[in-house]
A protein has these predicted regions:
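Bacterial N-terminal signal peptides that target proteins for export
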Residues: 2-16
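C-terminal motif of bacterial Sec signal peptides marking the signal peptidase cleavage site
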Residues: 23-27
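A short, surface-exposed helix-loop junction/capping segment
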Residues: 28-34
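Sequence contexts marking disulfide-bonded cysteines in secreted/extracellular proteins
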Residues: 29, 43-45, 81-84, 93-95, ...
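N-terminal secretory signal peptides
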Residues: 34-82
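Mature extracytoplasmic domains of secretory-pathway proteins
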Residues: 62-114
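Extracytosolic low-complexity repeat regions of secreted or lipid-anchored proteins
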Residues: 91-155
């Protein structure tokens, strides 16, 4: 009799464990990210080969895109996308970070950094939870450097 209770208890424990695992898997949502028009370009394939393994100690997260030109790290997600049109002249601040020019555009919930003088452009969205946001940009230097610098530079 006790044997039946034990095996029923073991089955119940196994079922509950499986339900918890499935629930956790279903709870894993991916970050919604739009794929830029030039994401499939040779330049973006080259840049994507240099995405950082971690950003500020944060590991990669799943995104809604299967494109290698789109990547996310951390929660809230730090998002990088390659394949955007190049940024034209702007009054937004322009920063030189380790030889890579970035235009910083303040958003309500963080900062959008876009490479300047590179075609196609790379965009990095940094939520305000990661202040000061520019400190994360060195992680993207190798990816940005994979796209040649054009004539435009930060002043």
């Amino acid at each position: 009799m006790r044997r039946g209770i034990t095996s029923r208890g073991a089955r119940l424990s196994a079922c509950l464990g499986a339900i918890l695992i499935v629930g956790e898997l279903l709870g894993c949502s991916s970050t919604e990210v739009a794929v830029p028009a030039d994401a499939g370009s040779a330049a973006c394939r080259s840049a994507a080969a240099h995405w950082p393994k971690t950003v500020g100690g944060h590991r990669p997260q799943q995104t809604s895109s299967s494109s290698a030109a789109v990547r996310a790290w951390g929660d809230p997600a730090i998002i990088a996308r390659c394949g955007l049109p190049p940024t034209g002249p702007t009054t937004d601040p322009c920063l030189d970070v380790s030889g890579i020019d970035w235009v910083a555009h303040q958003l309500t919930d963080g900062v959008r950094f876009t490479t300047y003088g590179r075609t196609p452009a790379i965009e990095v969205l940094v939520p305000s939870a990661y202040k000061p946001e520019p400190l994360l940009l060195p992680a993207f230097g190798a990816a940005a450097a994979a796209i040649p610098q054009g004539e435009r530079r930060c002043l």
